[in-house]
Amino acid sequence: MKAIASKVTRALPVGARLQCVDNTGAREVEIISVRGYKGVRRRLAAAGVGDMVVVSVKKGTVDMRREVLNAVIVRQKKEYRRPDGLRVKFEDNAAVIVSPEGVLKGSEIRGPVAKEAADRWPSVGSAASIIV
């Protein structure tokens, strides 16, 4: 995992549902915690593009449902600003399933991937077909 230059808005709190855009068998996942989040008392942990989260699989194949896994967020609807002044937002909130070390579990990623996620997680960047 590498550091990223831009400060991404943390728009996805615990409980948010995301589309799973890889070929692991999970279709929809729910965030149950954010890795490395240091917050304030009674504040819900929130995540943004490029963050690793712990998710529960809500929809998918029978053997994947109700599994607790790690995922990396690759798209979010809430816009965020890059250091060059460009504002980026996507059509949906999406994540890909990864191992605890950050290695992609699937072999393909559907749709575009944010540059911040691809730079921070090399295995996600190498599997992405489109990097925005």
UniProtKB/Swiss-Prot annotation:
GO terms for molecular function: large ribosomal subunit rRNA binding; structural constituent of ribosome. GO terms for cellular component: cytosolic large ribosomal subunit. InterPro entries: Ribosomal_uL14, Ribosomal_uL14_arc, Ribosomal_uL14_CS, Ribosomal_uL14_sf. Keywords: Ribonucleoprotein, Ribosomal protein, RNA-binding, rRNA-binding. The keyword Ligase does not apply. Transmembrane segments: none annotated. One of its GO terms (biological process) is translation. PANTHER family: 50S/60S RIBOSOMAL PROTEIN L14/L23 (PTHR11761), LARGE RIBOSOMAL SUBUNIT PROTEIN UL14 (PTHR11761:SF8). Binds to 23S rRNA. Forms part of two intersubunit bridges in the 70S ribosome. Part of the 50S ribosomal subunit. Forms a cluster with proteins L3 and L24e, part of which may contact the 16S rRNA in 2 intersubunit bridges. Belongs to the universal ribosomal protein uL14 family. This is Large ribosomal subunit protein uL14. It comes from Methanothermobacter thermautotrophicus (strain ATCC 29096 / DSM 1053 / JCM 10044 / NBRC 100330 / Delta H).
